[in-house]
């Protein structure tokens, strides 16, 4: 009988290191079903984990029809990572002949492969899960990364409290001024 597999917590969002450790625990407990691979590196150098789920006794993953499932494409989409963990747990628990066995899951993993990438954007997720969270839509890589900075536009947390609360700070000597007919617009100071 295979070793007991881990049970993820569904009342929390995992930080990157904890998530990879959990995925490795599945691979260690069920090497006949779960293979943890590295899909690539993030902008900040974190591994992008890929979990390959299939019954290796019935063939290699390269030789079976497949389905791809991913989560956390955008920084704050943490629930998608949890959904991937839930599905991984159901697949592993449901395969075989144990108390939670499900014949449909067994047939699926005997004849198919499931590629699960629970967190495509580990850098953005880490920002969202930080002690002082920062919520961005995408990744920490600047976008567009080849664009020159705009004079007068400073995209940063000025006071270091982890929040950007004000878009405009008046500066009588700055490069920009309010438009005379539409004060909500800024125009270059001439």
Please tell me what each predicted stretch does:
Residues 1-190:
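M14 metallocarboxypeptidase catalytic domain recognition
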């Amino acid at each position: 009988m295979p070793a007991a597999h881990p049970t993820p917590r569904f009342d929390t969002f995992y930080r990157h290191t904890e998530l990879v450790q959990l995925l490795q625990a599945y691979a260690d407990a069920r090497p006949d079903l779960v293979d943890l691979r590295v899909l690539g590196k993030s902008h900040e150098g974190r591994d992008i984990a890929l979990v390959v789920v299939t019954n290796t006794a019935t063939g290699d993953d390269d030789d079976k029809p497949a389905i791809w499932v991913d989560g956390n494409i955008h920084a704050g989409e943490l629930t998608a990572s949890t959904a991937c963990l839930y599905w991984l747990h159901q697949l592993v628990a449901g395969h075989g002949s144990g108390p939670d066995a499900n014949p449909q899951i067994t047939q699926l993993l005997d004849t198919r492969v499931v590629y699960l990438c629970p967190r495509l954007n580990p850098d953005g997720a880490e920002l969202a899960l930080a002690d002082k969270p920062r919520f961005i839509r995408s990744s920490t890589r600047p976008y567009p990364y080849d664009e020159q900075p705009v004079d007068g536009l400073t995209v940063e947390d000025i006071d270091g409290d982890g929040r950007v609360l004000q878009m405009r700070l008046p500066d009588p000597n700055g490069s920009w001024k309010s438009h005379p007919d539409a004060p909500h617009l800024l125009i270059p100071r001439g």
